[in-house]
């Protein structure tokens, strides 16, 4: 079905290269392990979850924004380190939380993530840079 759709689009917009159109309609997934490597991040919890796929990303420091605007989302990028982050991620079925700017959650947060089977990564990159790197690898926003 997807193949037919991009062929239909390429016929309608003949000035666009069909490979570009096909790329636009590709679904890109990335494993948590691939994100870790791309971001030069470290696992704080969830190495056993490293092969889970993620397709969409949302970034915010206000969990009210995450709850209000995060549509389909697999990964949450934040600099906020409090238990509400893990609780919010659980409510939205997020598989991975990435803490930016070198922020590290405390042991209580990691225990909560462990109980909810949510992978936790930390990177020294700023939030904007983290989002840009994942965007370059094909992931898109989940809002």
Predicted regions and their residues:
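Methionine residue identity
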Residues: 1-3, 16
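Short, Lys/Arg-enriched N-terminal segments with co-localized hydrophobic residues
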Residues: 11-29
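Short amphipathic alpha-helical surface micro-motifs
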Residues: 27, 38, 57-59
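N-terminal, charge-rich interaction modules
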Residues: 29-46
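Feature captures the catalytic cores and cofactor-binding loops of soluble hydro-lyases/lyases
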Residues: 51-52, 56, 60-75, 79-143
